[in-house]
Amino acid sequence: MRVLVIGSGAREHALLLALGKDPQVSGLIVAPGNAGTARIAEQHDVDITSAEAVVALAREVGADMVVIGPEVPLVLGVADAVRAAGIVCFGPGKDAARIEGSKAFAKDVMAAAGVRTANSEIVDSPAHLDAALDRFGPPAGDPAWVVKDDRLAAGKGVVVTADRDVARAHGAALLEAGHPVLLESYLDGPEVSLFCVVDRTVVVPLLPAQDFKRVGEDDTGLNTGGMGAYAPLPWLPDNIYREVVSRIVEPVAAELVRRGSSFCGLLYVGLAITARGPAVVEFNCRFGDPETQAVLALLESPLGQLLHAAATGKLADFGELRWRDGVAVTVVLAAENYPGRPRVGDVVVGSEAEGVLHAGTTRRDDGAIVSSGGRVLSVVGTGADLSAARAHAYEILSSIRLPGGHFRSDIGLRAAEGKISV
């Protein structure tokens, strides 16, 4: 089976590495890829938001299956075009991908499915913003306002703040750009990311993970696409894990089928484990980055066969997933000034070591690997427990040099110290 992976991040590097371990995968192709994926897959530079370009490439390389990594091609309907061309595709169609592409749509689906989430309100006019802010945040008894871009924002469209001026400025900027604003009540409790492979109403959960969205230590600073993650979660009871699948993911999958928007792909639910139980923070329509890097490091089942089963309506027959013992930790190395406009073009030293997954990298004509994006690399450490996996990840990271690069030193630290409980 020849597999074409769409995307250019560390998530796609992790997918390619896992697919390469599947004995039924005979060839790997990636578009557009990066300096790291070029070492393990045939690489093509195409516009991945163009359905025509992706279909043409899949035909050209003789792909038996296409796996779409990022959310933008999915929301634009690229998976629909691939399937219409008669090629197996892992990734939801445009209608189902609205679960991530529109937070208002996701809220409507959750309400119909009886799934607990934050109270919310859509604001589509600057004239209504101030009155809406009065109904949320501290005026409503919450510790902070939660102000979100209703559309895709690469993980950086959310502001959580106790400062009304900051909340208002973010909402006003979104509205000025023509984006509706979603105001939400504050959900308190540790967060969980759970990936589920979904084939209409069949749901196969992967290991739960936790990611770190803020750029700074102790969850300070601006939101990012993610600065690190670990899996599994030693503090998450099995009964809560099962409850998330049976009372959240399965009802949402069934509701999408009922609406004629059946989901086939990776459904990612972001949760807060509150005092009243799990509540949904967000749904995404694809593998998350950086959680994927940690979760797939522990997968023993053949990934290509798993994704192909889901994409061809045979997921119910796949069987129970197998996992390695232990824990995996991902730490992201970011470029100077990320999540603002990142500095690029710096030489990265030590990036070809085992456990290093590339994201914002390119290879110059002289062979040097240079930074080309905000999140430059992910390093993945594994170990018998969280402390050992953390030590392994930071040991790998210590041998990498990137001028101006920065990372968080506290990925998984509170959990390793036993400071998270539910």
From Swiss-Prot:
Manner of cofactor binding, per the entry note: Binds 1 Mg(2+) or Mn(2+) ion per subunit.
Highest taxon of source: Bacteria
InterPro entries recorded: ATP-grasp, ATP_grasp_subdomain_1, PreATP-grasp_dom_sf, PRibGlycinamid_synth_ATP-grasp, PRibGlycinamide_synth, PRibGlycinamide_synth_C-dom, PRibGlycinamide_synth_C_sf, PRibGlycinamide_synth_CS
Biological processes, Gene Ontology terms: 'de novo' IMP biosynthetic process; purine nucleobase biosynthetic process
Pathway(s) of this molecule: Purine metabolism; IMP biosynthesis via de novo pathway; N(1)-(5-phospho-D-ribosyl)glycinamide from 5-phospho-alpha-D-ribose 1-diphosphate: step 2/2
PROSITE patterns reported for this sequence: ATP_GRASP, GARS
Record-given protein name: Phosphoribosylamine--glycine ligase
Organism: Mycobacterium bovis (strain ATCC BAA-935 / AF2122/97)
This protein's encoding gene: purD
